Regions:
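Conserved beta-strand segments that form the floor/walls of ligand-binding pockets within enzyme
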Residues: 26, 67, 115
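Unchanged
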Residues: 73-157, 170
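Acidic, metal-coordinating catalytic segment for phosphate/diphosphate chemistry
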Residues: 1-43
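A short linear hydrophobic-aromatic micro-motif
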Residues: 15, 55, 98-102
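Conserved Nudix-box catalytic region and its N-terminal flanking loop in Nudix hydrolases
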Residues: 47-89
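Eukaryotic intrinsically disordered, low-complexity segments enriched for acidic and Ser/Thr/Pro residues
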Residues: 160-163
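Short acidic/glycine-enriched loop/turn segments that link adjacent beta-strands
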Residues: 21, 62-63, 107-111
Length: 172
């Protein structure tokens, strides 16, 4: 979000030099810079001991492609806590391991995605109302039904890291 008016006092902001950051909207009344803001989210590729990954169908996102677990970070929450919470809320699963897989910028949504790989032993998910279906698939089948690889898609950078971690050739 780009600020044009001060969220505290409503005064129109002016561009002001902010060190190395260049011209940043500034409130002369509050004496505060207003840097652009964006949403912080988590996205988790869940896998099990049988080298399967959990794919979900969320029809409000796509009727054609499957996704992996994701959600917004709540203010005051760490990315790791958000990842564990989202997996529990959406799938009823408790992760035994959670490994950071980097970050990914999703420009269409102005979101910074905090990427994770999460391990749990195989058990059937208990779906929240926002998940239409979820199932385990062999790891090499993920590209068949997931959103296609693209610069905006955070799934595939995580997928390639998981393939490498588990000793699979990384050719996707």
């Amino acid at each position: 979000m780009h600020y044009e008016y001060c969220p505290h006092c409503g005064q129109k902001l002016v561009d002001r030099q902010a060190g190395d950051d260049g011209l940043i909207p500034y409130c002369n009344s509050c004496k505060k810079y207003w840097f652009d803001t964006f949403a912080s989210c988590v996205i988790i590729l869940i896998y099990n001991e049988q080298d399967e990954v959990m794919l979900c169908r969320q029809e409000y996102l796509s009727k054609e492609y499957e996704v992996i677990t994701s959600g917004f970070i709540i203010p005051g929450e760490t990315a790791e806590a958000a990842a564990l919470r989202e997996v529990k809320e959406e799938l009823g699963l408790d992760l035994e391991e959670l490994e950071n897989a980097g970050t990914h910028w999703f420009g269409r949504g102005d979101m910074l995605m905090h990427c994770f790989m999460g391990f749990t032993h195989k058990k059937e998910p208990v779906l929240s109302p926002e998940i239409n279906a979820a199932h385990w698939v062999p790891i090499l089948q993920l590209p068949e039904t997931a959103f296609p690889d693209s610069p905006e898609n955070a799934i595939f950078p995580i997928y390639r890291k998981l393939l490498k971690k588990l000793g699979y050739p990384v050719n996707v």
